[in-house]
């Protein structure tokens, strides 16, 4: 697995600084965005907000993100976060009314933000290594005639995504377990529930619990929990 220059502890410390600024504080979307921006800009992360309507609770926020490799300055690898090339999108009910996030919803948001940024930073590290070694990028190739289901299979089976989602699975389990407990739980991966790790369950549902793809994913997730 790829080792990010940004450690888990750095992300946790930044989220710890954010918590008292937003939990039980009525804030508009732009105020929440500014609080996250202050912490994550130095890591090369742009924070945006996106209103999603009734599918998101009025006082809830969720997160998504992506790494934009085309915005990477390949000549500046000595300072890899000088360029903003990861977007953290905060998804909320609307941007016109204050949002008051309670502690329970904060714990959910914190996990999603940590998982999202870590996931995209793994992709950034992959991109850096690939450019240095091979001088270019590679992405999953989708045939125009593929169904959405088949495109999802191609996406999930891409080695870069397996690396990043293995880290997601480890972070999922660490929400409720210690490292040792999470490692032991993952050894019995066929018993893990949707609530414990949605992405692991999707991989098992998509490829089968005894597939090579799932075995590779599990090996990487277990290695992550050993560190």
Which residues are covered by each model-predicted region?
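Proteolytic processing junctions in secreted/extracellular precursors
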Residues: 3, 11-12, 20
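Post-HEXXH active-site segment of zinc metalloproteases
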Residues: 111, 127-156
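Acidic, low-complexity, intrinsically disordered interaction modules
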Residues: 111, 115-116, 128, 173, ...
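Long, well-structured alpha-helical subdomains associated
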Residues: 148-227
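Extended non-catalytic scaffold regions that mediate assembly and binding
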Residues: 55-63
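Active-site scaffold of zinc-dependent metalloenzymes
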Residues: 62-111, 124-128
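Active-site recognition of the HExxH zinc-binding catalytic motif
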Residues: 115-128, 164
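Zn2+-dependent metallopeptidase catalytic core
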Residues: 21-46
């Amino acid at each position: 697995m790829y080792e990010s220059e940004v450690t888990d502890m750095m992300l946790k410390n930044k989220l710890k600084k954010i918590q008292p600024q937003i939990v039980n504080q009525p804030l508009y979307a732009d105020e929440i965005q500014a609080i996250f921006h202050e912490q994550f800009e130095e890591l090369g992360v742009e924070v945006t907000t996106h209103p999603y309507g009734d599918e998101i609770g009025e006082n809830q926020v969720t997160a998504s993100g992506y790494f934009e490799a085309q915005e990477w300055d390949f000549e500046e690898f000595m300072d890899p976060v000088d360029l903003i090339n990861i977007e953290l999108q905060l998804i909320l009910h609307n941007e016109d009314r204050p949002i008051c996030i309670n502690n329970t919803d904060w714990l959910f948001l914190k996990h999603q933000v940590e998982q999202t940024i870590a996931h995209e930073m793994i992709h950034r590290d992959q991109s850096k290594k690939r450019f240095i070694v091979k001088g270019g990028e590679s992405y999953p190739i989708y045939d125009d005639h593929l169904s959405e289901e088949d495109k999802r299979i191609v996406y999930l089976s891409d080695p870069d995504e397996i690396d990043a989602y293995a880290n997601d699975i480890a972070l999922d389990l660490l929400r409720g377990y210690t490292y040792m407990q999470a490692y032991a739980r993952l050894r019995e991966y066929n018993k893990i529930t949707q609530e414990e790790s949605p992405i692991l369950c999707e991989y098992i549902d998509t490829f089968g619990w005894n597939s090579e793809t799932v075995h590779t994913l599990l090996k990487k997730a277990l290695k992550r929990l050993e560190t």
